[in-house]
């Protein structure tokens, strides 16, 4: 396994791999890896002979300087996990090599409609930072495939749209959310939960799953279902940040043409913000929206 921190050195290695006819699968991460990330690696290994993982805590997608400072840095442990998983190359650039002129002078990429709604309203600039770094990493790595988790549903939708809009020759591989035995979606943030919070945390997925059943039943207006779900979470000690039920393709309001809806959940448990989502197939014979 190679660990490369220099973009030019990476370019040279990529050129060599391309000359050899090797296909490349790419997994971009910000480190602090868990089993969910390793599932992305496995998905890449099913597609290509060479798997490259980047570990880069991207300052452009943080709109809170303290969050950036506090983000866990576990490089040694991450590299051990990736070596054991059979990753071929780990790319670990410094911010100065990715943004040599600083963030304010950096050209950026933005997918306007998908980036400015839902999570984008709560975190201004976050998705612009995400799409910019993913675009730059795609240019450096030149992958044939790129693997993204479905847990970050809006991020996945934005990356798909960016690749389509810009004509990138990359196949995006969505990978199902990995869950703990209790149903909680795996996340780097779960390690911040106290023992008591870890006992409460699975309720987020349980409420979401019941919400999915109720959405499919189509007997109650979506706004009422959302309010009821928020009350259940708040009464259990969560602080509901946002619950949305939107068209799974457009991320806009569900309408009579929507084939699938996605339930997007975000709630604080103590200081930790947990997210989850679930796609629901719609039957419009009796939809209440």
UniProtKB/Swiss-Prot annotation:
<dbReference type="InterPro" id="IPR014729">
    <property type="entry name" value="Rossmann-like_a/b/a_fold"/>
</dbReference>
<protein>
    <recommendedName>
        <fullName>Pantothenate synthetase</fullName>
        <ecNumber>6.3.2.1</ecNumber>
    </recommendedName>
</protein>
<dbReference type="GO" id="GO:0015940">
    <property type="term" value="P:pantothenate biosynthetic process"/>
</dbReference>
<comment type="subunit">
    <text>Homodimer.</text>
</comment>
<feature type="binding site">
    <location>
        <position position="61"/>
    </location>
    <ligand>
        <name>beta-alanine</name>
    </ligand>
</feature>
<comment type="function">
    <text>Catalyzes the condensation of pantoate with beta-alanine in an ATP-dependent reaction via a pantoyl-adenylate intermediate.</text>
</comment>
<keyword id="KW-0963">Cytoplasm</keyword>
<dbReference type="GO" id="GO:0004592">
    <property type="term" value="F:pantoate-beta-alanine ligase activity"/>
</dbReference>
<keyword id="KW-0547">Nucleotide-binding</keyword>
<dbReference type="GO" id="GO:0005524">
    <property type="term" value="F:ATP binding"/>
</dbReference>
<comment type="similarity">
    <text>Belongs to the pantothenate synthetase family.</text>
</comment>
<feature type="binding site">
    <location>
        <position position="155"/>
    </location>
    <ligand>
        <name>(R)-pantoate</name>
    </ligand>
</feature>
<feature type="binding site">
    <location>
        <position position="61"/>
    </location>
    <ligand>
        <name>(R)-pantoate</name>
    </ligand>
</feature>
<dbReference type="InterPro" id="IPR042176">
    <property type="entry name" value="Pantoate_ligase_C"/>
</dbReference>
<feature type="binding site">
    <location>
        <begin position="149"/>
        <end position="152"/>
    </location>
    <ligand>
        <name>ATP</name>
    </ligand>
</feature>
<feature type="binding site">
    <location>
        <begin position="186"/>
        <end position="189"/>
    </location>
    <ligand>
        <name>ATP</name>
    </ligand>
</feature>
<keyword id="KW-0436">Ligase</keyword>
<dbReference type="InterPro" id="IPR003721">
    <property type="entry name" value="Pantoate_ligase"/>
</dbReference>
<keyword id="KW-0067">ATP-binding</keyword>
<dbReference type="GO" id="GO:0005829">
    <property type="term" value="C:cytosol"/>
</dbReference>
<comment type="pathway">
    <text>Cofactor biosynthesis; (R)-pantothenate biosynthesis; (R)-pantothenate from (R)-pantoate and beta-alanine: step 1/1.</text>
</comment>
<feature type="active site" description="Proton donor">
    <location>
        <position position="37"/>
    </location>
</feature>
<dbReference type="Pfam" id="PF02569">
    <property type="entry name" value="Pantoate_ligase"/>
</dbReference>
<keyword id="KW-0566">Pantothenate biosynthesis</keyword>
<feature type="binding site">
    <location>
        <begin position="30"/>
        <end position="37"/>
    </location>
    <ligand>
        <name>ATP</name>
    </ligand>
</feature>
């Amino acid at each position: 396994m190679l660990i490369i921190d220099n973009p030019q050195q990476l370019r040279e290695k990529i050129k060599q791999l391309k000359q050899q006819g090797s296909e490349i699968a790419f997994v971009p991460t910000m480190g602090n890896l868990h089993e969910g990330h390793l599932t992305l690696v496995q998905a890449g290994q099913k597609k290509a002979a060479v798997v490259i993982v980047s570990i880069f805590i991207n300052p452009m997608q943080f709109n809170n300087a303290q969050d950036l400072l506090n983000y866990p840095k576990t490089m040694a442990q991450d590299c051990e996990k990736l070596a054991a998983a059979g990753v071929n190359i780990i790319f670990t650039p410094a911010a100065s090599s990715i943004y040599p002129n600083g963030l304010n002078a950096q050209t950026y990429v933005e997918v306007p409609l998908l980036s400015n709604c839902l999570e984008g309203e709560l975190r201004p600039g976050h998705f612009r930072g995400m799409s910019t770094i993913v675009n730059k990493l795609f240019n450096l790595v030149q992958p044939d495939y790129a693997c993204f988790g479905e847990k970050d549903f809006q991020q996945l939708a934005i990356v798909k749209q960016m690749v389509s809009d810009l004509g990138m020759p990359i196949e995006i591989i969505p990978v199902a959310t990995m869950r703990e035995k209790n149903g909680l979606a795996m996340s780097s943030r779960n390690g911040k939960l106290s023992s008591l919070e870890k006992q409460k945390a699975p309720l987020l997925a349980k409420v979401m799953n019941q919400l999915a059943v109720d959405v499919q039943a189509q007997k109650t207006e979506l706004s009422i279902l959302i309010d009821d779900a928020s009350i259940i979470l708040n009464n259990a000690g969560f602080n509901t940040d946002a619950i949305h039920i939107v068209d799974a393709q457009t991320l806009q309001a569900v309408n009579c043409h929507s084939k699938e809806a996605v339930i997007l959940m975000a709630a604080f448990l103590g200081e930790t913000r947990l997210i989850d989502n679930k796609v629901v197939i719609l039957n419009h014979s009796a939809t209440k929206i």
